[in-house]
A protein has these predicted regions:
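Bacterial N-terminal signal peptides
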Residues: 9-19
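Periplasmic c-type cytochrome electron-transfer domains
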Residues: 3, 22-520
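Bacterial N-terminal signal peptides that target proteins for export
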Residues: 1-11
Length: 520
């Protein structure tokens, strides 16, 4: 797309951005100062800083992620909420809705000017709420809470399944006979695979995942491996902004192996990695890699959904959920072996401390410090311990849920297989279904068929008390606005003047910055 007015080249960043710059979703304080001091406190050029850089380059994304990681998370959130302008590259791609949509579904995407436009409820929080016409019947944008946990679980499952495959090949070659092994990871059965002595594979019994055994946790049909690909694709397809110089996707998409700043391994020799989009015809690369780095790191560390009121009714509802067979696919808990995050936030119903929305968050840091002797701030690196992800409710498998869930593709084919959508947050993400066609939880459950027919029928046969308890349980799995939710980092203070507009508490992470007075 074309930039409408003068553009400046940001020194050292290798990217064009407008010198006039930027309004945020709630305003950019550097462009529209206000007495309330509400909005984003840094300009877009300040957020880009010294570009990608390295751990020895102050102001670069790599430096901040490794030495001031909570600032990097907050900066990623501010970029997520930023309302990008046409002067910054936002706007229609050159095709502008014209072309062969059978082969390029992005023609029907966007246009948005902010990540929070599609992932906006509640209050720009990375939640659900946007319909995009990437399919004839549209897609309802899912929420992004716990996105990093999903990426890590899917990647570890992939590693397990491929290790089983490789072991089967080795045994077949050793014994000179075919070897069949079950594909199981984190308690989930992905079928079986048979290896032949010549190294060939029979993958006809692989279930719920591609035959290359790569679990793709993003999008309804399971089509994307990593947060980084997701971010770069959304910037281009939904916002018309090209991160064409992204070094990680450039290398991995051409067969290389890279580790992103968030610790995700992208290996083009094993997986098909989406390349970054081509440069804009007029303006070239429009998104500095530093922007992608901060967005990726923010989403890796983004908070998981909350639990609202838990009582005897929700306890009974959880038992009904298990009894009806829902938990055979919507598996509640899984364990990450190597957690790449630097913090975890547990948010629960607490009307005493959560005086504004009855939720209160407890933050726990998950990093260690290392002085590298450089004179810079110490490195703050992920501990990499195991972590139990509770109440995610998915199996990371694709399933055929029957004709009620099928969707049309532009080329006339039908999409029949969909990932089991995690149920955390489901109480605040209606309407339901990948297409947003089901208005209530009751509707979307009764819509199930195919592999879920038995569970659907068991649900339909529930007596009213069991039904009400089950729905109460599901409705207790909620999303929340972090900037309006009190926490151990920023507790509520009802004595503040003009409470609750002031003093309601938040999970802004500012107190964990190296310099908490330097606001993002």
């Amino acid at each position: 797309m074309r930039l409408l007015e003068r553009v400046l080249s940001f020194a050292g960043a290798g990217v064009l951005f407008v010198g006039l710059a930027s309004q945020a979703q709630m305003i950019d304080n550097t462009q529209a100062p206000n007495t309330a001091k509400a909005g984003i406190n840094k300009s877009l050029l300040d957020e880009i800083g010294a570009g990608r850089g390295d751990v020895m380059t102050p102001g670069s994304s790599i430096f901040i992620i490794n030495r001031d990681p909570f600032r990097a998370i907050r900066r990623g959130r501010q970029l997520f909420q930023r309302k990008f302008t046409r002067l910054q590259g936002q706007g229609a791609n050159e095709k502008d809705g014209v072309g062969d949509i059978n082969n390029d579904i992005a023609i029907g995407a966007g246009l948005s000017d902010s990540c929070a436009l599609c992932h906006g409820r509640p209050r720009g929080s990375g939640g659900a709420g946007g319909n995009v016409v990437t399919r004839p019947d549209s897609r309802d944008a899912g929420h992004l809470f716990g996105l990093g946990l999903k990426e890590m679980l899917a990647d570890e499952i992939t590693t397990d399944l491929r290790a089983t495959r490789d072991l089967a090949i080795a045994k077949a070659q050793q014994t000179k006979h075919p070897v069949t092994m079950k594909l199981v990871s984190k308690g989930v059965n992905y079928g079986s695979i048979t290896a032949n002595p010549d190294g060939s594979l029979d993958t006809s019994k692989v279930a719920g995942v591609d035959t290359d055994l790569r679990v793709k946790p993003f999008f309804a049909e399971g089509s994307t491996i990593s947060i980084r690909e997701f971010v770069v694709g959304a910037l281009h397809n939904e916002m018309g902004m090209e991160a064409s110089a992204d070094p990680d996707l450039l290398a991995a998409s051409t067969g290389g192996r890279v580790v992103t700043p968030s610790g995700m391994v992208l290996d083009g020799s094993k997986d098909k990695i989406s390349p970054p989009p081509a440069p804009d015809d007029q303006n070239g690369n429009e998104v500095d890699p530093a922007i992608v780095d901060h967005l990726e790191f923010y989403l890796l560390n983004y908070f998981k959904p909350a639990h609202y009121i838990q009582n005897s009714s929700t306890d009974r509802g959880r038992a009904v959920f298990n009894k009806t067979g829902c938990s055979s696919c919507h598996i509640p808990d899984m364990t990450i072996n190597h957690d790449r995050r630097v913090a975890d936030v547990e948010t629960v119903y607490d009307p005493v401390n959560g005086v504004f929305n009855s939720l209160f968050a407890t933050a726990s840091t998950l990093y260690y410090t290392k002085d590298d002797g450089s004179g810079n701030p110490v490195l703050k690196l992920p501990l990499g311990n195991s972590f139990v992800v509770r109440d995610i409710f998915t199996d990371f498998k694709r399933h055929d849920l029957g004709a009620n869930f099928y969707e049309r593709n532009w080329d006339g084919t039908m999409q029949t297989m969909f990932l089991t959508r995690p149920l955390w947050g489901v109480g605040t993400t209606g309407p339901y279904g990948h297409d947003g066609r089901s208005i209530t939880l009751n509707d979307v459950i009764l819509r199930h068929g195919g592999e879920a027919q038995a569970a659907r029928d068991a649900f339909a046969a529930l007596k009213s008390n069991d039904l009400n308890n089950l729905l109460a349980f599901l409705n207790s799995l909620v999303l929340f606005p972090p900037d309006d939710t009190a926490s151990t980092l920023d507790p509520a203070d009802p004595s503040k003047l003009n409470f609750p507009q002031f003093g309601h508490g938040s999970i802004k992470l500012t107190v964990l910055f190296n310099d908490p007075t330097d606001l993002e």
